[in-house]
């Protein structure tokens, strides 16, 4: 087709493929064990995998959840509550709880914004100002989307915007 032959096309104009907006890249992270089963169901609906970040207390309180996450092919990471005085020690305790339960540890950690990175972990940081799914989907830069409630609505927003949704892993190219 020549542009002038398309309905609404202007003679002599062409669309620059480089000018077309690329789909957003969004790395998915899930927190809050109370909503993780709903998040798993939403991910399954969209045929996606996610990274789920648990505290030591969440691992100890709901060990069945850890097994369900792993059985569904999701990645387990660790997190600490906001205001944790010693994030590195809290991560070590959570990793020990995980290892006692499933005989494996993780290097993946999601820490509060401004926390110091814990040695020996691949640390990602929750955004200081949380990003919504709509903001992440409209962005041209990669975003970390931390979901703790209503994952289905967030995933729908990403899906309808053709965003590229990726599981946050130790090897993720997100800074």
Where are these regions (language model features)?
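Catalytic domains of cell-wall/extracellular-matrix polysaccharide-remodeling enzymes
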Residues: 81-175
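Active-site beta->alpha N-cap acidic-glycine motif
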Residues: 2-97
């Amino acid at each position: 087709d020549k542009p002038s032959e398309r309905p609404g096309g202007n003679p002599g104009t062409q669309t620059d493929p480089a000018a077309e907006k690329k789909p957003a890249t969004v790395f998915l992270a899930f927190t809050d064990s109370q909503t993780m089963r709903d998040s798993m169901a939403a991910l399954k609906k969209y045929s996606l995998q996610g990274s789920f970040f648990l505290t030591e207390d969440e691992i100890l309180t709901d060990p069945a959840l850890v097994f369900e996450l792993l059985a569904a092919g999701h990645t387990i990471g660790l997190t600490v509550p906001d205001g944790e005085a010693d994030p590195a020690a809290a991560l070590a305790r959570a990793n020990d709880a995980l290892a006692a339960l499933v005989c494996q540890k993780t290097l993946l950690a999601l820490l509060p914004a401004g926390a110091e990175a814990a040695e020996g972990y691949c640390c990602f940081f929750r955004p200081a100002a949380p990003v919504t799914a709509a903001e992440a989907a409209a962005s041209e830069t990669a975003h970390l989307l931390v979901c703790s409630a209503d994952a289905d609505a967030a995933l729908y927003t990403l899906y309808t915007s053709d965003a590229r949704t990726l599981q946050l892993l130790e090897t993720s190219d997100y800074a």
